[in-house]
């Protein structure tokens, strides 16, 4: 109410950054500049642990431990992105059977059918991402690649120009 009376602002000053971000996103979407796909690693990205080494029962995901809660929250966030039209895909150095077992973990939020593509193999991740882009007929600039491993992120960023590769600070810890 203070800002209305002083400056005739129709909203709280704290709301302006959120509004500006929303307007910017609308403008970006009108010009086709939003990201369309999120490509995810599995081990230590969608769950804590390495499914091939720890087994499904050894993964940290779900309400039992704080680390597992964090991964479940991240999976919920990814599921919410899917619900608004973001395409989800997997790019993981894993045996496919292990990857699918991890994605079917009883405490997991995401399931194999949430992903349009699951590349769980031992090929370089940049090649898998290029294959996913080709299958979906999307340019690399439509993708975000999320991986806990800084070396994998660096390779993908160098080999797949245009893909967004955010640093997952703290993921290695």
Question: Where are the regions a protein language model picked out?
Answer:
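Well-ordered alpha-helical segments embedded in enzymatic catalytic cores
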Residues: 22, 73-77, 128-131
